[in-house]
């Protein structure tokens, strides 16, 4: 019988030849992308396929050995059946001989009994003859006994022959009984061998089922391998397309990098402008303090230098506190910026820029209001000399309130400046209250000339001239204009940064959408490859099962039926 699995080596060679281009494609993919999960899955499936092929080869070898042993056992069973048929024929012959010999023995016994009866009858006749001879004259006894003795001798001779025949028949019966016992033993051995053959046939059927299962698994693995090969080909195509897309998107990436570099440069410029703005604010605050504490007319010098110096010292202390807080906030922002991602940091910087732009607009509006108040003061400077001292002091209170409003607008641009403003308000309000009380005291002292002379003599000590006020006011106006221009430039730059950030966001979203599409396509390809592998494995299993069933021996079950009939 031909081996149905004799072409296993040819199939392995064909599979290896098919795997070579797939391995080259996998090496190319690994060169492009490093470790590939598809290649890992392919290697795992190839290892499983090799393991299953080894198991299939072992199962085929076991099947061949079992088939050879089954053939030998079938031959032994056939020989035993032939021997059993011969022994059965011999038994039948011996039984027929025994029956014939038994019949002959019965006949001999009957003849023996008849001879004994004849002997007894002859003896009785002899007795009668002797009795009759005594009475009457009879023929001689010897003449009568001679034929009878001859017959007796013949009968004894026949009896001896029959006894010899009976002994020979007994020996034959004993030998036949021994042969029957041996035949029964051989029949029992044949039955045991037949049961072993049945067990082996059952095992062979189980092994055939396992072989079919292994063949189905091999078909499934072949299908999966084909699907993986198709997936690899599709992935190579997608890799090529992605490379083309990457090459096409190189210009976009370069543009994004240019935008990022421009954003960094603009952030640096914004930081420098923030520093200059802080310096300008400090100088503007100083100028505002000087302007609030100085008057134009040299004859009507009101505010003493000591009070101005104290207010200046307080404001400088508050500004130093604000600077310290600003430095701490900048350090915290830097430490947080190092931990956060680039895009989040840029977005937060843009948001802070927008917030700063709104606060700057508020500050510029407050400064314009303060500039308008200063202009009105400069216009009404000629009338201030004619007013009395209590009106001048009330104007001092109004200038202090405008200074407080200006300090409010300046402190809102910094973090943590509310507490210093409250303290400054309290201090200024205290000074205003003092001024108002002084004005009320002046109203009361207008009646007496001596008190007015003493008051003017005390307040004219250590005062500042009004000419410095005009120069400081001009410098403040120029600084405000420069700050306004810087604010406008910062707003323009912030708008440009926002536009760049929006473009970066759109580009990142487009890249993410493309990546999601690629992932979905790869998942669909993997599903299709799995389905193709399953179909391939099922086809291979069906083909192998059909080839194995077609190559099986047709008269394989005939010895079983013959042995069963003999049993």
From Swiss-Prot:
Coarse class of the protein's main subcellular location: cytoplasm
GO BP of this protein: cytoskeleton organization
Disulfide bonds listed in the record: none
InterPro entries: MAP70
Localization per Swiss-Prot or TrEMBL: Cytoplasm, Cytoskeleton
One of the record's GO molecular function terms: microtubule binding
Sequence similarity: Belongs to the MAP70 family.
Protein name listed in UniProt: Microtubule-associated protein 70-1
